[in-house]
Amino acid sequence: MANILKTIIENDKGEIRRLEKMADKVFKYEDQMAALTDDQLKAKTVEFKERYQNGESLDSLLYEAFAVVREGAKRVLGLFPYKVQVMGGIVLHHGDVPEMRTGEGKTLTATMPVYLNALSGKGVHVVTVNEYLSERDATEMGELYSWLGLSVGINLATKSPMEKKEAYECDITYSTNSEIGFDYLRDNMVVRAENMVQRPLNYALVDEVDSILIDEARTPLIVSGANAVETSQLYHMADHYVKSLNKDDYIIDVQSKTIGLSDSGIDRAESYFKLENLYDIENVALTHFIDNALRANYIMLLDIDYVVSEEQEILIVDQFTGRTMEGRRYSDGLHQAIEAKEGVPIQDETKTSASITYQNLFRMYKKLSGMTGTGKTEEEEFREIYNIRVIPIPTNRPVQRIDHSDLLYASIESKFKAVVEDVKARYQKGQPVLVGTVAVETSDYISKKLVAAGVPHEVLNAKNHYREAQIIMNAGQRGAVTIATNMAGRGTDIKLGEGVRELGGLCVIGTERHESRRIDNQLRGRSGRQGDPGESQFYLSLEDDLMKRFGSERLKGIFERLNMSEEAIESRMLTRQVEAAQKRVEGNNYDTRKQVLQYDDVMREQREIIYAQRYDVITADRDLAPEIQAMIKRTIERVVDGHARAKQDEKLEAILNFAKYNLLPEDSITMEDLSGLSDKAIKEELFQRALKVYDSQVSKLRDEEAVKEFQKVLILRVVDNKWTDHIDALDQLRNAVGLRGYAQNNPVVEYQAEGFRMFNDMIGSIEFDVTRLMMKAQIHEQERPQAERHISTTATRNIAAHQASMPEDLDLNQIGRNELCPCGSGKKFKNCHGKRQ
């Protein structure tokens, strides 16, 4: 282990030396750029773009381009990037993460690689965690980019598609991570190419990269529509039942935060819902509602995991930033269960139309980089998942902050008493204090204690984040006391007021350790910026979540033996033990994210295939007849092959039914037309007849443009409907394969294999529906804007007809489960009439 650490440290040192040499080359252009007039300096952008178009690489332009940005920043912003900032910029250009301490000027550092990569004309996305930071950085740094001749756009959720498209067309686009994801999903749901807003994803520079790519990695972005099934009554019933339980009726695993019914709880459920066996197959839906009600009532905590807004809505609290996540809802019915718990209106369940996780969204960029002050602890995950290195950049000035050892108390009460006393003492001498909490509830509790102690203060949490910038701006002033929930990702520096340096700078007090060392380091990093003095102190208790989960029992015995109910234990060993516990949690979380990615990669591969084919259809300026006719041919082949093992009469009747109800006019084909033909001849006969029907259908359309429009809308509508159903089916499969681990099967391998089979089934189903709609649609000539309405189809009654068309004397027991159903539906037997068996 020691050798591994030594190798890592040596590699970092070697990388720093290499970066210093590259930065020195940038500095060699300093005098040359300073000698240029404003117009000459601005003209460099045009020169660089031409050189790039003529074959020069961005790497070869780096030294001059960085020097131009440095000089431009000095003239426009009054800021001149330091050597360490240039080094950070080089790391960003190479698609890695520079770890730069708070206050080291990451925003200015980003200007150099952003400018350089924007020269390609392919677009640069600067990604932030919230719209406030997007607007702030775009306004401040946009002044420099515009002066240098580059266009800057801001992509906000409130903008229209046209405004979004304009923002994405700019050389540099500022946006939040979620908005880029939703725009990507929405682009892959439009019917016309002109309605797409994004260009191909080129280069992303992610601010607070660890927050987005690690903390929110598993967060799925979901575009959904309303579900037709009304379920609010079931949520209320499950909630009422769960609230009636005693502690013995359920089992909570504190470490994994999971919950389930005990034997007595199962008995009570069967009595409450009047069931013989709760876990009978027909009660699967009910157990899902009960599981969500259990989680909502006993795992999800008000003012920690979520808050109830004044509008009676459940708002999720981001566990890493303390902000509420507007518009974000828990999936799979958990949000509705919480609404039932809190007695607020239950919103309709939704059905997922499209989804993607941040992991897979950002892996789609040609080049990805990001900035953070605390990324080294997650280096393995950055490297394994995103192929990104984390390179620590030296500070411009030595760090003077004093990090005290943790103080451990026996109880939460004694801990908070000590926190209030410490804050009061520092307030009285004028030293500003930032108190970091992990929950809204804790910040409110400390606030009440400080009011009682006569200490004026500000509170920053999910309930009042709109005043965030103003509160943080004043947090470094003399005598300021600020309580903040999870300072991670706040993005605003705390600058020291007059006379504060002499008082020891800003003191950061942590009221408990977070699961992640990185979040603790981010809180600490708010103090001691740019060589300022500062202090940090963490207060812990044996009743804290982290301590309860990892080994507080042994320490509890020490407190009891020494009779130290009000006193604290302080030692470096304790701090190391806490960090070891955090490492275990981080390891567990990483393993979970890695497993999620393995599942999500199945969806990613399938999504990329569907979206690529969808894009080809949308952007096609050609007659799609070859594609549609190929679908018709494959559908005919599937149906004929699917009945190859049936008796001749039964086979012909099933094929005839398929042809009548899905392919040809009902009275245009008889049994005699197919009798005596081989399977190959039947396929050819049906296909040739289908081509004539196809030509007849197309001839009803006004002109070539109407034909193209009709073809596109037809294919896209079918693909979108089938893809939505497929996403739902994959979600259900994912929940089901977990149980296969008990049969010594690898759930991920099972999911991959079954998911692949389901995808192939979906493709067959898409081609079947396109065939049926194309051949059976009642086409009326209309004006072009009504093109989407051309598909006035008899499909509904066709479905009823072919479902009723099963030959009466057919022995269903002779049909294989994976063969096509003889009724002609195009579905496998197990998913059609076989299901009813």
From Swiss-Prot:
GO BP, one annotated term: protein transport by the Sec complex
InterPro entries: Helicase_ATP-bd, Helicase_C-like, P-loop_NTPase, SEC_C_motif, SecA, SecA_CS, SecA_DEAD, SecA_motor_DEAD
Its EC number(s): 7.4.2.8
Domain of life: Bacteria
Cofactor(s) recorded in Swiss-Prot or TrEMBL: Zn(2+)
Residues noted as binding Zn(2+) in the record, renumbered to the chain: C821, C823, C832, H833
Sequence positions that bind ATP: Q85, G103, E104, G105, K106, T107, D493
MF (Gene Ontology): ATP binding; metal ion binding; protein-exporting ATPase activity
Membrane topology summary: Peripheral membrane protein
Subcellular location field: Cell membrane; Cytoplasm
GO CC, any one term: plasma membrane
Free-text remark on how the cofactor is bound: May bind 1 zinc ion per subunit.
Cited HAMAP family: SecA (MF_01382)
Family: Belongs to the SecA family.
SUBUNIT field: Monomer and homodimer. Part of the essential Sec protein translocation apparatus which comprises SecA, SecYEG and auxiliary proteins SecDF. Other proteins may also be involved.
Protein name as catalogued: Protein translocase subunit SecA
Organism the protein comes from: Streptococcus pneumoniae serotype 2 (strain D39 / NCTC 7466)
